[in-house]
Swiss-Prot record:
Residue intervals passing through the bilayer: none
Prosequence residues removed at maturation: 37-58
Localization in the cell: Cell membrane
Gene Ontology terms: cellular component: plasma membrane; side of membrane
UniProt source species: Arabidopsis thaliana (Mouse-ear cress)
Post-translational modification: Contains 4-hydroxyproline; hydroxylated on Pro-30, Pro-32 and Pro-34.
Name of the molecule in the record: Arabinogalactan protein 21
Signal peptide positions on this chain: 1-24
Length: 58
């Protein structure tokens, strides 16, 4: 009985540490800058135009 309590306590501690580490990783992640999508605007626009053109052609 004592061994089962000890294993349960270790399991609870491991889960608590893993949960707190995952929460800390999401909290410490830096926010993307407002200009981070500026480099993606031209390729996205080009892909959209190509998709529309191929839709009209085919």
């Amino acid at each position: 009985m004592e061994a089962m309590k000890m294993k349960m306590m270790v399991f609870i501690m491991v889960v608590a540490v893993a949960f707190s580490a995952a929460t800390a990783a999401t909290v410490e992640a830096p926010a993307p800058s407002p200009t981070s999508d500026a480099a993606m605007f031209v390729p996205a626009l080009f892909a959209s135009v190509v998709a529309l053109a191929s839709g009209f052609i085919f």
